[in-house]
């Protein structure tokens, strides 16, 4: 919702100021289809060349995540803290024997089932269970557990950030692609140099639409979406840090 409002403000302010200053919108409207085809087509083609199929597929999901924002709510963080307290309390009271059945089948465990939203994130649940198991067999070395968890979190973040990095590269390249489209427009104009001034002016104006579109798409569309996706990924990664902090703190205090 907030993203949509932002895009509306961009369009109203950019094109509204142009029209209010006496600009001829028909020049932009006439040049827009073929300039957009050149810029968007080149950007999408370069995106396909530069990225794996997995990253390309995740990019669409990533854009949707940028619009939706982080998936975790305040209650989810409270539930996660409660879950970690319950799990670690069970381990403290009953040891590894009491905890292992819950780790083997968390979807059937009475410790996990009260929190269905957490259970839906299979990677988070696996992360919790794997390192609790590691703690039960290597309880005397909390630093090793911490190092392993840091490496796992970093690996997960790197995998999740692939589409965001690809979108940011696309955003960085769009102004240059706008120049490419503008140069093509100038070449077309030079082929009609014998035309009247009015026609040449309209053709040059249409060519400049390419530069305009490249910069607009970069800094007002793709770039902001990439930044919002990065913010979303960082927010969605916080539960892993919470789990790591809880497990390491428990291990170090024993």
Language-model features and meaning:
Residues 2, 19-161, 235-254:
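Large intracellular
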Residues 5-8, 12-27, 145-148, 152-230:
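Helix-termination/interfacial motifs at the ends of transmembrane alpha-helices
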